UniProtKB/Swiss-Prot annotation:
EC number(s) reported in the record: 2.1.1.297
Binding residue positions for substrate: N182, P183, P184, Y185
Reaction catalysed by this enzyme: L-glutaminyl-[peptide chain release factor] + S-adenosyl-L-methionine = N(5)-methyl-L-glutaminyl-[peptide chain release factor] + S-adenosyl-L-homocysteine + H(+)
Residues reported to bind S-adenosyl-L-methionine: G116, T117, G118, T119, G120, D139, W168, N182
Superkingdom classification of source: Bacteria
Species per Swiss-Prot/TrEMBL record: Cereibacter sphaeroides (strain ATCC 17023 / DSM 158 / JCM 6121 / CCUG 31486 / LMG 2827 / NBRC 12203 / NCIMB 8253 / ATH 2.4.1.) (Rhodobacter sphaeroides)
Disulfide bond positions: none
Protein name (record): Release factor glutamine methyltransferase
PANTHER family: HEMK METHYLTRANSFERASE, MTRF1L RELEASE FACTOR GLUTAMINE METHYLTRANSFERASE
Family listed: Belongs to the protein N5-glutamine methyltransferase family. PrmC subfamily.
GO molecular function: nucleic acid binding; protein-(glutamine-N5) methyltransferase activity; protein-glutamine N-methyltransferase activity
Amino acid sequence: MRAADALRAAVPRLAAAGIDEAARDARRLLAHAMAIDPARLTLHLPDPLPPEAAARFEAALAARAARQPVGQIVGERLFWGRRFRVTRDTLDPRPETEGLIEAALAEPFATVLDLGTGTGCIAVTLLAERPAAHGIATDLSPAALAVAAENAAALGVASRLELRLSDWFAAVPERVDLILSNPPYIAADEMAALAPEVRLWEPHLALSPGGDGLDAYRAIARGAPAHLRPGGRLLLEIGAAQGRAVAGLVEAAGLARVSVLPDLDGRDRLVSARLPAA
């Protein structure tokens, strides 16, 4: 069987399983099975598909038909132009989270704290973009911290990033220039409506704090003033309907210059605030 024939058969199979981007996902999984760069797949479609590659492709298709995310199947996800290892112990880095990176890089910083780091994509990216900066990244999951450590090492920032097992600020006595977080923010009653890729395959600890979805923001807002240097910034990713509530929590904690920033689709995506300089 040629690779092209395997791809042609795979697309309707994934579509029948409810995969919206069946052709895109089939191509990515075939490239993974053939151990080639996805950008070069078209050049190899006329090639015979070796039995071992065919077996890998079949296993990958079965996993995707069961709605496992492509990133988990291939073991990596692109974020800000870099490849990050992902597992079932971490959320896949989302394109919308790149808005946090863009906002963070708009001003200088020497020290950064990433709360609930997961894959480490936020902290690692910021340190890779700012070679003189140092950071701390926390998570409640030892397994997630292990993934973050792999990514920090692979992308050359391990010597400048300290990973800590911590419930938000519990293991962080320091003050920093910049605090960021993409915390769990799905309300308990919204979990059932999530896509199967998220609801069935990603860690619920990283998705929802339970209740109204705001508990993580309450904890971060309470702790941020004691962990920011004067003039330091807080950047939080939020759900589309949470802008007013999260901004209110941050203002009540004593931070200033609080604003809600939209994503490229015009939906509320970030809350930005600053500790007064004096």
